[in-house]
Amino acid sequence: MRPRGLPPLLVVLLGCWASVSAQTDATPAVTTEGLNSTEAALATFGTFPSTRPPGTPRAPGPSSGPRPTPVTDVAVLCVCDLSPAQCDINCCCDPDCSSVDFSVFSACSVPVVTGDSQFCSQKAVIYSLNFTANPPQRVFELVDQINPSIFCIHITNYKPALSFINPEVPDENNFDTLMKTSDGFTLNAESYVSFTTKLDIPTAAKYEYGVPLQTSDSFLRFPSSLTSSLCTDNNPAAFLVNQAVKCTRKINLEQCEEIEALSMAFYSSPEILRVPDSRKKVPITVQSIVIQSLNKTLTRREDTDVLQPTLVNAGHFSLCVNVVLEVKYSLTYTDAGEVTKADLSFVLGTVSSVVVPLQQKFEIHFLQENTQPVPLSGNPGYVVGLPLAAGFQPHKGSGIIQTTNRYGQLTILHSTTEQDCLALEGVRTPVLFGYTMQSGCKLRLTGALPCQLVAQKVKSLLWGQGFPDYVAPFGNSQAQDMLDWVPIHFITQSFNRKDSCQLPGALVIEVKWTKYGSLLNPQAKIVNVTANLISSSFPEANSGNERTILISTAVTFVDVSAPAEAGFRAPPAINARLPFNFFFPFV
C-alpha cells in the first residue's frame, strides 16, 4: 500500500532516495597513505526485487561483481605541476618539491584533488603543510567521497569513452602498420581503441624560442636564483634566451669535493641533443680555463683538462681549490633550429672559510651559424644606458654608413682632470640614451695665432672626427631603412661684436624622444635631434699675450610623449528622413 495522494513515480523516487540515504549515513574513513596508493572503494547500489513493495527503503545489497579500478589515480594527479623537473611554488602535489622548497611555501594552491565527480564513490586527496616540523613537511590524506546524487555513475563498462581518441592520419610511413592493424579496413570497437592508444606523440623537428635544451638524460641545467639569492640547479636553459645571472651557494668547505655544482664536470659532461628527441648529440667543448687566486689575480691555463675541487689544509686554515666561480656557455645554432656547437669557459678559484657562502656567475649566449653578431641598443626601443646608433649618408639614395665601434658613432668631448683639450684629443665620450651629460676642457691661445685657424681647431674639437648626419629612431633600426632614420638638424648661433674674433664655445645636442607602442610595454623612439653650435666673440689679443678659453659640450634628452587619452566612439547618428506627407491629413 502507498500513501493516498502520492503518484507512483514519486513513490519510486522516494524509494531510491531512501536507498541512497542508507549509504551516506556512514562517514567515510580518512586515511593517510603514501602517494602510490591507487585503490579506491566505490559505493554500490543494491537491486530492487520485484516482490518488494514500492516505497519501502532497504540497505544496499552486496555488489554483483568486483569494483572497478579508477581510471584516474588521484594520488599521482597534480594539476598545478606545470614545470617539468622543477618545483612549482605552492604546488603541494608536485613530486619535484623537497623539504627545502616547502619552507618557502605559504599555502597549497590546490588543496584538494579529486577525480570524476559523476561517480558514486571516488577517491580524493587533501594536501596541507605541517609548518611545525623542522624542516616543514607535506601532509596528504586519501579519503573516500560519496556522491549523494541518485543519478551518479556506479560502474564504467566502456573506459575509452572517458577520453577523446585522436585518430592517426595515414601517411607513407605508417600506412603498412595501419593496414595490419585494421585487418582489411574492417574496424571494430576493440581494434580501434587498441591501435589508437599506442599512437606516438608528434615531436618537434627543431628547437623553438624558449624551449628547454634537451640532453641525453634530461635537459641542460642553468643554475639561477628562485625565490631568494640561493642557486637552484634545476632551472633549464631555454633556446635563444640569453641570460646572465648571479646567485649564492651555501657550502660546507669540508665537503667541497662532494658538491657537484662546484665541479667542472657538472657543466661540461652533458651532451646537448642537436634537435629535440634526437639521437644526434653535440658535446660541450671547454675552450678556456682561467684561475683566480685569493688576491683576485687571473691566470689562464694553457690546457683545458677537467679539474676537480680539492680540499687543501694550509696550517690552521682549509682551502678548496679548483672551485667553479663563473660559467659561460656559447651555443651556435642554425636557422633551422638545430644546435651545432657548444663552447664553455670557466673561471676557477680558491675558496676559504672567509668567503663562504660562495657567489657564482652563469652566462649563456646564442650565436647563429655563419653570421657576425651585431650588438643592438634596444629591441626595438632604446634601452637607457646604451649608446645611440648614428651614421651618415654618403650620397642620396644610399644606406646609412656606421662605424664598427658602436660607442663611437655619436660622441662628445671627454673631460679629464687636467682639463687640457689637446692632451686627449682623440678620446671621446659616447652619448648614452637617457643620460644627460656635460663635458668641457680648456684651450690655451697665444696672440700670434690667427683667429680663423683657432676657430677651425675649436670646431674640430667640438665635432670630433666624422660627426654623423642621422640617428636611428629605434635601437634595432637597420642601416638600409634610410627613410626611417632621423636627420640631425644643425643650428649655428653667433654673437657679433666689432673688432672681435668669433670662436665656437659650446655644442649643445638635444634629443627628443617619445614612448611608442602599447601602454603596457612602451618603447623609446627618437623623433628629433638638434645640434646647436654656439659661437662667442673674443677680443683680438696682442702679440705674445696668452689667454685661456673654455669650450664645452652638452647632451639633453627631452621626453615629448603625449599623455595617454581614452578613446571613445562617436554616438551613432540615424540618417533618416520621414516622407513629406507622413502626417497627412493632420498637418
Swiss-Prot record:
GO terms for biological process: central nervous system interneuron axonogenesis; cilium assembly; dorsal/ventral neural tube patterning; in utero embryonic development; neural tube formation; protein localization to ciliary transition zone; regulation of smoothened signaling pathway; somatic motor neuron differentiation. One of its GO terms (cellular component) is cytosol. It is found in: Cytoplasm, Cytoskeleton, Cilium basal body; Secreted. Residues 1-22 form the signal peptide. Residues 51-68 have a biased composition (Pro residues). PANTHER family: TECTONIC FAMILY MEMBER, TECTONIC-1. Component of the tectonic-like complex, a complex localized at the transition zone of primary cilia and acting as a barrier that prevents diffusion of transmembrane proteins between the cilia and plasma membranes. Regulator of Hedgehog (Hh), required for both activation and inhibition of the Hh pathway in the patterning of the neural tube. During neural tube development, it is required for formation of the most ventral cell types and for full Hh pathway activation. This is Tectonic-1. It comes from Homo sapiens (Human).
